[in-house]
Amino acid sequence: MAWNFGNILDTIIPVLPEGHLALVHGDREITWAEMGRRSNNLGRFMLENGASIGDKVGFYMRNRPEYMETLAACFRARLTHVNVNYRYVADEVHYIFDNSDAAVVVYGKEFRENVEILRPRLPNVKLWIEVGDGANLPADTYDYENLATSGKGENLKVAREGGDLLFLYTGGTTGMPKGVMWEHDALRETQTMALRALGDVPETLDELKAH
């Protein structure tokens, strides 16, 4: 089985202790099991409603649990994360989503005004998903929480590859932001090289499960 972050999540979540926390944000606490179910539900929804393997997913949010859940959903559904600095103005956000050919955009409700400016300029975006309270959603927009909690949370039956991609856009200090493409197995190997200096590290998913 390939070293892919989706496979890693599928491997470790079932063997973690009940109640083991994955995300803590203020008063919110989300266990690994909860994040696993929610990310599977979200990933399945995207694949069943217009997104295809390898499609880009634009993240237009502040740091919050939904960001990490959506990232996990992308890993598990073989979709490609595209980051954007939430401080960007509409034209800058448009550049990144257009340049990356984003097919899905997940955004925080506080950015709705900018998103409404962007929609007509991004005709190739198939799904708009809003993270908020679900109130007064714009037309053709899905409520994140409803998607994350709808379904059984079962693992996706997707054959992943180590060459699946993760996009990280640069800050654009020497021009416009550039989309740096990381393969899952290359990013994992970079992390593992540093960890080897501290001792033995798992070399297979089976070793990881037993670690």
Regions found by a protein language model. Name each.
Residues M1-W3, N136-D164:
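Flexible, low-complexity linker/hinge segments
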Residues L9-T31, N136:
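AMP-dependent adenylate-forming
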Residues D10-T11, L47, P65-V84, V93-H94, ...:
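Hydrophobic alpha-helical segments in the ANL/AMP-binding
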Residues L21-R64, M68-A72, V89-H94:
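Conserved AMP-binding/adenylate-forming core of the ANL superfamily
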Residues T31-A33, L165-M193, L198-E203:
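Conserved AMP-binding A3 loop
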Residues E48-N49, R76-T149:
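Structural core segment of the AMP-binding/adenylate-forming
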Residues V57, C74, V105, T170-T173:
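Conserved S/T- and glycine-rich ATP-binding loop of Class I adenylate-forming
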Residues S150-G171, G175-M176, P202-H211:
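Conserved pre-ATP/AMP-binding loop-to-beta segment of ANL
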